[in-house]
């Protein structure tokens, strides 16, 4: 089913209050958002909160420090009841989850049993994020290695993602593929084509701003991927540290101190009228003071929107 057919079908079943796998698809996800000023709420990964606190108190701390949401790994290590209770007590949102099995059991693996494990895990994540009141699951699309060729990963992962579409349609949740250091989909033009070939409104990109600085410029990716970007991850990166100390050392730089040209990056976010609603920090965590600093830095970055 292509985008046009899916949207027509969703409109019909919503009006008819039909039951079945399509009935719960989220109409708001599929509707084209009106033009207007881009607005982003702040979120951070739960693992970044290093204070020795209960789940509820970690959520409360995040809220006190100016964060509107928390991103969880999924399937979660907590029960749904625990998560919802802590969410309500803190008055915080849980808009996105990161599937935790896509590296160990990648969607590009040549073994069908391995792919099945990941598909089942992502299906659980789609239901989980819906139950939590969110709308998006982050998924790594695949991994290229010495034993898995680029072309093989491309075709295999696309087919696996297509197998996930019925679960996305049933829940109305989005599958957002993240650009990571997986030796795969290394240009924005290719990343755009990958999504367009899948051709479904509930499959797009979870764009990581810092991950591309190793070999590109995030503003280029943002303009090319455009409306295919569902959510944004926030990272900083230093090419100087990369060149002098090693690839992974490039991430060891504070927000606003690396090579992201934040006014230019956020101008691109504004230009595409990004309506994903969230900017989620994925940087080194720490105590209350460190997290407050991150929150303040994010405020400055968001201020460059227009």
Predicted regions and their residues:
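A structural motif
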Residues: 67, 129, 134, 229, ...
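Active-site acidic/histidine proton-transfer and metal-coordination neighborhood
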Residues: 10-18, 32-36, 108-204, 263, ...
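Conserved beta-strand positions in the central sheet of alpha/beta enzyme cores
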Residues: 71, 96, 138, 230-233, ...
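Catalytic domains of carbohydrate-active enzymes, especially glycoside hydrolases
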Residues: 56-76
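Glycine-rich, proline-tolerant flexible connector loops at the mouths of alpha/beta enzymes
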Residues: 72-88, 141-148
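Active-site beta-loop-alpha junctions enriched in small/polar residues
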Residues: 47-49, 73-75, 99-102, 142-144, ...
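Histidine-acidic metal/acid-base catalytic patches
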Residues: 2-43, 48, 52-63, 188-204, ...
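Short amphipathic alpha-helices and their capping/turn segments at secondary-structure boundaries
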Residues: 77-91, 121-131, 217-230, 267-268
